């Protein structure tokens, strides 16, 4: 196929008038067109088992305005799929769109829109299928204009002369007089020989054979290829930096358009992909955000035009929103808290929000302060950030109060110098106490968290108890110890056997641990030491219990014997808690006894008759009666050591001669008719061994005994607990605040007034019973 490339094309190149059938003609044109572009085509595509006529598909899409118009409509391709009678139009719509884009989109651009086609790699073979027409128009606008006098190349197979070839390179109307002379010279040179042909040939035209250039020659392809080339844009094809790096650089530039662009992207990323938004991956981004926030706040204070102030505040709000979204993650909160100038920038932002009365900006700043306050260290009560927060304690807005109270409580928790929360006015504390009476759970929890940190200082506690609001606070704390309590029932089984005596708590006057075992326990750390000590001195028993005060006093006496007084490594409340770790069924609870209406006990354990070692071996006392009538009483670890002790210290030949057993109150005596012999000695020694306890020989000979029993359901009011059964939530915080008040100088007087009410609460709510036990132990 030969063509003449001219400035304008009057009729479509791909036309075939010999074809009468429209569909066949269209398929022939499309197939020829695709071969020219070098793109494979399937002229009979199918969706499922139903064939799709490309001609019908093309007409329907063009009728609706083209590919982009159909794709912009929500159900555009679905409606076309319905017209093709597809069983599942919604599913077939995507397949139909894919068929059109692969086989017909280039024909639409060429035939319908009459635009220059880009390469197949950027059109039908591209993954980008949006705004196709706009991208092609941009491609056409970037192409260089065609020259006014294009070179015309004519395919001529009849002549090979230089004259014909030269005429094919120029227009006929451009020949002038000089060209005519050249033509005449060329005509005459054909009939006359050349003088000095060797030198003349080297100075005139070279004797190179010339051949006609067909249309599909290399020169024609080079001209076609270079006619569409455009100079590459600056930076085209170079992979730029990551998005977050560009955002950080845009923030550093402090140019308004760049900052607006960066803020827009960061707001979207921090909201939609907050789980992947890690500031540690780009360390400079957190610093840029904090610095940009301070820059916009400072700029808003310096400008005077209302429009400029509004623009600066909008940018500051956007940056604060990004920081607020990011610090919801613990890792990001730690990273932002370690950023320089974050405290001063937050203080300036809070005061700026108050100055311009911008509540949205203020809430974002307070949220940021709340989330990072756990990792901040404010060690001076004159810190401007701390003082700015204290100004909000008189606010009537609950949302501002909640954020402020939580932030101050967390700052006080990290206060190493004990300087914070000690310069607050009495009216501020009275307002916070009044918040405890509200029905808002969030404000009550925030107020209790603040009061817990506030009452850890003794001076604050003394001032609080001396105020008029003290008893109102105590009443509310006792009420909140049962906050949202739910009724539960505990089943207790009591055996109804007459042979068994009534269950009593174990006395604490049994044999104490030897000093060598205490030395091993002292080398351990709490709470492992307490757990090991309980297992050495007590054993599980579902029918017994031990008073909490007795077991604590016994532990204190053993530790004082081993390491001296006032060196306890665990508090009474924590000691009571670890009982459940030492024994699975041990529970701290309250019971009624004939002596007292309420007794704090540990149910499910009893005192061992003889203690065991840390490794679990049982100690046994030597009960051999001496000549003075007293028992030896030495503790020995295990039966073999006790047997060796008897042989070495007590069983002498004189004892064997008497034939009497002197073990405690044993009356055994060998009956012999003859003088003492080895047989009588053996009988006495065999009898003495029966007094020695051997764990390995213990067996159950009577089997299980069934006895009638009674079950009692004890009603309880249980508040919120965690997975391990420990108290949590408002009830726990209220109990801890009350415990701090009881520990003060006026604590005994306060506890004596509320003791009955607190004991009643602890008997109904076992979750707070360990903390009430600590209050009781503190009064001893």
Swiss-Prot record:
Domain spans labelled ARID: 20-112
Residues with PTM Phosphoserine: 696
InterPro entries hit by this protein: ARID_dom (IPR001606), ARID_dom_sf (IPR036431), ARM-like (IPR011989), ARM-type_fold (IPR016024), Chromatin_Remodeling_Comp (IPR052406), DNA-bd_RFX (IPR003150)
Gene Ontology BP terms: chromatin remodeling; regulation of DNA-templated transcription; transcription initiation-coupled chromatin remodeling
Entry's localization field: Cytoplasm; Nucleus
PROSITE patterns xref list: ARID, RFX_DBD
GO MF term (any one): DNA binding
GO cellular component, one term: RSC-type complex
Modified residues (Phosphothreonine): 230
Coiled-coil segments on the chain, per record: none
Keyword field contains Transport: no
CDD domains for this protein: ARID (cd16100)
Listed Gene3D superfamilies: ARID DNA-binding domain, Leucine-rich Repeat Variant
Alphabetically ordered keywords of this record: Chromatin regulator, Cytoplasm, DNA-binding, Nucleus, Phosphoprotein, Transcription, Transcription regulation
DNA-binding region in chain numbering: 530-609
Pfam families: ARID
Major location category of this protein: cytoplasm
Subunit structure: Component of the RSC complex composed of at least arp9, arp42, rsc1, rsc4, rsc7, rsc9, rsc58, sfh1, snf21, ssr1, ssr2, ssr3 and ssr4. The complex interacts with histone and histone variant components of centromeric chromatin.
Family in the record: Belongs to the RSC9 family.
Function: Component of the chromatin structure remodeling complex (RSC), which is involved in transcription regulation and nucleosome positioning. Controls particularly membrane and organelle development genes.
Xref: PANTHER family: AT-RICH INTERACTIVE DOMAIN-CONTAINING PROTEIN 2
Name of this chain's protein: Chromatin structure-remodeling complex subunit rsc9
Organism: Schizosaccharomyces pombe (strain 972 / ATCC 24843)
């Amino acid at each position: 196929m030969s063509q003449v490339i001219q400035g304008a094309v009057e009729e479509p190149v791909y036309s075939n008038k010999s074809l009468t059938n429209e569909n066949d003609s269209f398929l022939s044109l499309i197939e020829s067109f695709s071969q020219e572009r070098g793109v494979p085509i399937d002229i009979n595509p199918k969706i499922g088992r139903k064939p799709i006529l490309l001609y019908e598909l093309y007409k329907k899409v063009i009728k609706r305005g083209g590919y982009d118009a159909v794709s912009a409509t929500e159900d555009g391709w679905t409606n076309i799929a319905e017209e093709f009678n597809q069983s599942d139009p919604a599913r077939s719509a995507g397949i139909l769109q894919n068929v059109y884009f692969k086989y017909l989109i280039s024909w639409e651009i060429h035939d319908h829109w009459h635009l220059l086609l880009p390469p197949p790699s950027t059109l039908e073979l591209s993954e980008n299928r949006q705004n196709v027409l706009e991208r092609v128009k941009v491609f056409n606008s970037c192409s260089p204009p065609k020259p006014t006098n294009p070179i015309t190349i004519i395919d001529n197979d009849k002549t090979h002369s230089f004259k014909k070839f030269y005429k094919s390179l120029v227009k006929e109307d451009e020949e002038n007089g000089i060209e005519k002379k050249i033509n005449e010279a060329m005509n005459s040179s054909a009939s006359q020989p050349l003088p000095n042909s060797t030198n003349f040939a080297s100075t005139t035209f070279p004797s190179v054979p010339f051949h006609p250039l067909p249309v599909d020659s290399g020169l024609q392809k080079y001209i076609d290829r270079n006619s569409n080339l455009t100079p590459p844009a600056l930076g085209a094809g170079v992979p730029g930096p990551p998005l977050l790096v560009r955002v950080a650089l845009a923030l550093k530039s402090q140019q308004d358009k760049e900052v607006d662009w960066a803020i827009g992207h960061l707001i979207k990323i921090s909201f939609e992909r907050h789980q992947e938004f890690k500031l540690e991956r780009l360390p400079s981004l957190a610093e840029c955000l904090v610095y940009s926030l301070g820059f916009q706040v400072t700029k808003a204070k310096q400008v005077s035009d209302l429009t400029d102030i509004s623009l600066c505040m909008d940018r500051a709000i956007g940056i604060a929103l990004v920081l607020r979204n990011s610090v919801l993650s613990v890792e990001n909160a730690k990273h932002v808290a370690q950023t320089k100038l974050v405290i001063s920038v937050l203080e300036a932002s809070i005061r700026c929000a108050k100055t311009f009365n911008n509540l949205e900006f203020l809430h974002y700043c307070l949220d940021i302060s709340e989330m990072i306050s756990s990792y901040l260290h404010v060690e001076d009560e004159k810190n401007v950030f701390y003082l700015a927060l204290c100004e909000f304690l008189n606010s009537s807005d609950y949302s501002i109060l909640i954020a402020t109270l939580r932030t101050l409580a967390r700052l006080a928790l990290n206060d190493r110098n004990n300087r914070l929360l000690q310069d607050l006015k009495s009216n501020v504390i009275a307002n916070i106490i009044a918040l405890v009476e509200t029905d808002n759970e969030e404000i009550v929890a925030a107020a209790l968290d603040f009061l817990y940190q506030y009452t850890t200082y003794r001076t604050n506690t003394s001032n609080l108890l001396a105020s008029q609001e003290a008893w109102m606070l105590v009443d509310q704390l006792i009420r909140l110890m049962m906050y949202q309590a739910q009724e539960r029932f505990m089943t207790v089984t009591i055996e109804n056997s007459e042979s068994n005596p009534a269950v009593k708590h174990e006395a604490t006057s049994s044999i104490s641990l030897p000093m060598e075992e205490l030395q091993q326990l002292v080398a351990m750390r709490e709470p492992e030491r307490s757990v090991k000590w309980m297992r050495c001195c007590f054993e599980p028993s579902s029918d017994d219990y031990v008073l909490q005060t007795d077991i604590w006093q016994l532990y204190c006496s053993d530790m004082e014997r081993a390491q001296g007084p006032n060196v306890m490594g665990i508090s009474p409340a924590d000691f009571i808690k670890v009982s459940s770790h030492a024994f699975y069924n041990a529970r701290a609870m309250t019971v009624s006894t004939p002596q007292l209406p309420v007794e704090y006990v540990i149910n499910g354990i009893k005192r061992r008759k003889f203690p065991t070692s840390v490794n679990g071996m049982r100690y046994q006392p030597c009960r051999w009666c001496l000549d003075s009538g007293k028992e030896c009483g030495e503790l020995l670890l295990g039966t073999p050591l006790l047997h060796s002790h008897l042989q070495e210290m007590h069983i002498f030949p004189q004892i064997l001669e008497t034939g009497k057993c002197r073990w405690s109150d044993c009356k055994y005596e060998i009956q012999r008719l003859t003088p003492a012999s080895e047989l009588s000695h053996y009988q006495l020694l065999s009898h003495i061994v029966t007094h020695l306890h051997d764990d390995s020989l213990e067996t159950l000979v009577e089997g299980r005994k069934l006895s009638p029993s009674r079950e009692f359901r004890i009603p309880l009011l249980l508040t919120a607990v965690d997975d391990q059964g420990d108290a949590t939530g408002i009830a726990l915080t209220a109990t801890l605040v009350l415990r701090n008040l009881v520990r003060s100088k006026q604590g005994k007087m306060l506890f004596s007034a509320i003791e009955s009410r607190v004991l009643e609460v602890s008997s109904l709510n076992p979750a707070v019973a360990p903390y009430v036990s600590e209050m009781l132990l503190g009064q001893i």
